[in-house]
């Protein structure tokens, strides 16, 4: 009996982008080739890249055999579905929603540091270092940057914006830090939960645990109008969308010259 397919860390989010009317599957663009494709079924087979996991807790023991952050999958799936449907009453209790948002952030940061992790491995493998030394150096590099970020975000206030008028793109690097990605800087971070739902984090000013998650219906994109552009700019491997038109609009960014 074959072992089950390994689950991509972002698979819980990708489920909200599966087209389930008639031909079931996901529309995506390959950022390496610029090819637009339709992935049949619900497995998101195009999202097959390997992840390097680094535990970000300061005192956490690094175990290379651990493949990702611990998440409560059932509660996370319920929260993501409720966000996409715009039904907070179906998201679970306040505590369950807070835990789901915590899991979302851990997965978002997990995806955010993959490029840095791969670059670090490429760099250290060219040095005269043993495998365990390479791993230790990688862990130090990632923790130096992303542990403070994770601690800061743990104190943010979070809002689920649902019913967005424009469908969102979702990529292999879906977390957007608007504090550094746009000028002038905007004081929030975001993560798509589905085509029409977005998790927004803003500074709370508190030094203890953040407040309960808020839910708001979006009446316009407002300052989020650049979301899809920023998503396309940071993508390295793939981008999913709800329509081919969305992907065609960004295809020139990824098309390779024939010459």
Language-model features: locations:
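Alpha-helical structural context detector biased toward long hydrophobic helices
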Residues: 1-259
């Amino acid at each position: 009996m074959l072992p089950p397919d390994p689950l991509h860390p972002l698979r819980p989010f990708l489920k909200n982008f599966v087209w389930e009317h008639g031909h079931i599957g996901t529309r995506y663009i390959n950022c390496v080739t610029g090819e637009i494709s339709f992935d049949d079924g619900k497995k998101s087979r195009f999202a097959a890249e390997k992840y390097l996991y680094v535990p970000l807790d300061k005192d956490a023991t690094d175990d290379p055999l651990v493949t990702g952050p611990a998440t409560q999958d059932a509660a996370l799936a319920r929260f993501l579905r409720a966000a996409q449907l715009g039904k907070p009453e179906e998201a679970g209790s306040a505590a369950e929603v807070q835990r789901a948002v915590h899991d979302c952030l851990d997965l978002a940061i997990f995806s955010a540091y993959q490029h840095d992790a791969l670059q670090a491995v490429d760099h250290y493998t060219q040095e005269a270092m043993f495998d365990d030394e390479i791993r230790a150096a990688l862990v130090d590099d990632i923790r130096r940057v992303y542990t403070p970020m994770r601690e800061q975000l743990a104190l943010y206030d979070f809002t689920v914006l649902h019913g967005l008028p424009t469908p969102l793109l979702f990529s292999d690097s879906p977390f957007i830090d608007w504090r550094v990605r746009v000028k002038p800087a905007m004081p929030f971070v975001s993560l798509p939960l589905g085509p029409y739902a977005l998790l927004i984090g803003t500074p709370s000013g508190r030094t203890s645990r953040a407040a309960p998650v808020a839910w708001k219906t979006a009446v316009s994109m407002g300052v989020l109008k650049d979301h899809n552009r920023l998503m396309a700019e940071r993508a390295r491997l793939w981008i999913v969308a709800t329509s081919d038109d969305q992907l065609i609009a960004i295809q020139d960014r990824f098309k390779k010259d024939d010459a």
